[in-house]
Amino acid sequence: MKTFAIPAYHRLAATVLLLSAAVSTARADEGQWQPHQLPQLKSELKRAGITIPAARLADLSKHPMSAIVALPGCSASFVSPDGLVVTNHHCAYGAIQRNTTPQRNYIVDGFLAQTRAQELPGGPNTLLYVTDRVENVTGRVLDGLDATLSGRARHDEVERRIKALVAECETDKAYRCAVPAFHRGGEYYRIRQLMIRDVRLVYAPADSVGNFGGDIDNYEFPRQAGDFAFLRAYVGRDGRPADPSPDNVPYRSKDFLAVSAEGLKAGDGILLAGYPGRTSRYRLPAEIRFARDVEYPARAASITADLETIAAATAGNPEHEVRYASVAKSLNNVLKKTRGLMDGFARKDIAALKDAQDAAFRTWYAAHGSGGPALLAELDAAIAADMALSREEAAWGEATHSDLLKSARTLVRLAIERQKPDAEREAGYQERDLAFIKARLTRLEQSFVPAVDGARYAAALARYARIDAAARPAGLDALLPPATGAKALVAASELGDTAKRLAWIGRAPEALRASTDPVIRLAVRTQDAAQALEDRRKDVDGNLERIIPRYMDAVIAWKRAQGKPVYPDANSTLRVSYGTVAPYTPRDGLVKGPFSTVQGILEKNTGKEPFNAPDKLLQAIRDERFGVFRDPLLRTVPVDFLSTADTTGGNSGSAVMNGRGDLVGLNFDSTYESITKDWYFDSAITRAIHVDVRYMLWVMKEVDHADNLLREMTIRYPKPVQRQKRAARGVGR
């Protein structure tokens, strides 16, 4: 069985027995918990082998939580006092791509800075966030709201209160604050994060290490991806965040994670901390069916067509292929996840399971609820309105699917919003957001080619024309260019020039309306339609925000009455999950995991992408230069491993820690059968995939010779005597 790669029969038999035991004892480790909830889980954490006091885990100022950080869309952690950060290779891909040229291809060859002076700028989108304060502000957001307000009026009042809370929090400009909703608007927490703006690329292995197996192995196991990279946070000499500058110095992180090369075995407990993006476990059956039958099939078809267009438009041009490498990688990841969701819904009728849960809840609510049947009727109507509007929003997405047009629309909206007092501007267009807008408009140059963008827009307009007329925003058709004219429209625009694009920042609406640039003219022409759609969304959301919190209060009470876990859906805020190292059975007669090894790289390697491992890595495997990273039972180096931890998108790069809080791996994926966990957690098949620290350290030592980083980190190596004793006793993985 490839997963184990064990040369001796008796070792294979012993491992299978251990795996069988692990399968039978794997527990339902459901929950993406807010840190302050962890003291309620003392017994569960103890059962999982976590020895860190729960009260300590709840304290963001103490180790290990103070070492957990966020990147845009990803998670990471400090691993040295000098701001060294470890995350996934795919999370650092934008920084790698930004510094890559056809002559100096860091995507293909990898990159290692032997000195601090050699570290490369991560670019305007590579930001680091350190959460240092979380406070419950539910009362300040919701108390005293007039129950008779319309949906739009309620939405606007809640937004006004949230903006005031954010402004109050951001008096120190080193911090970025937000007030996200939890439990679908039932609770609000104000979160303060130190925002570090100078983040540099330190080390990334070759793409054929970090992304070995590519999209073929994405969401699959066993796999052998070394999905890791290192960044470094820099600040001004006063220790405060500063714009990128050669005068900046490494950030002195208060805490950092030690790295354990001592290894794990099946059944060992792990703790995982990061910033999961979004789950939908409290959605109603109607919402599940909408996603299953409408949203996901349309998304899969659109992304498939978009990827085909990008491939055709960049073919034969290495520079264009590099420009769109990150875009294609991201789209492929979303596509495979979407198809996995569709397959998962086909394999297991989650909507029917939710029907049964919903029926049981409504029966309980009839006896215990305070809102009566009117609340549930209101809820069903609000959900129906939300789904109907979502169809039009999807059509709008196709009608405006041009990166250059999106930039023009940003400029038009910014000009309009800047006519208002700052507190009255739309969120995202306030003074606090100007640096982000400029960075976003600048960043376009990394992944933009006029001919490619024009081809993508032409294909998107053709897709839009095939959407049912009832699902297209009223009046939009007459405002759009013909699909046949999209390429010429993009080619004729001056916005493709970064300097000219940025020069429009701060211009008045009249100047934009007077522009002869065809893309700006299209953005101006469609602005009223965009505003109308946004206004309708605010009204729908306001109605949902009025009804759903009361519904969620009842659902929480119902779940607690059954002794079931109650945690909020993921929303890109700091969460903690726990689990055990465990295999799983995706189908009858097949047991997978929990470890893959470097032997699998030799078996899969074809010399052709995506199974084209570097020669120096292959030679190190053949020479068995495994050293202290050799597992005593596997007799080789583990690459990736499985656990029962509860994860989702955004958890990429999350620190996987052992029971005492040492880093033992990085989360980067989940199994294909697990993808529907965003909607329904099935403990039997839900497995997260992590890269093993031992493989990371082995690649750094034996393949890329990143000795400077190995010296910088605090690494707990296994004691030779202990390893020998364990091997003699036959203790396995």
How would you name each of these model-derived features?
Residues M1-P7, R11:
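Positively charged n-region of N-terminal signal peptides that target proteins for export
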Residues K2-F4, V16, V23-R733:
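Terminal presequence/propeptide segments associated with secretion/organelle targeting
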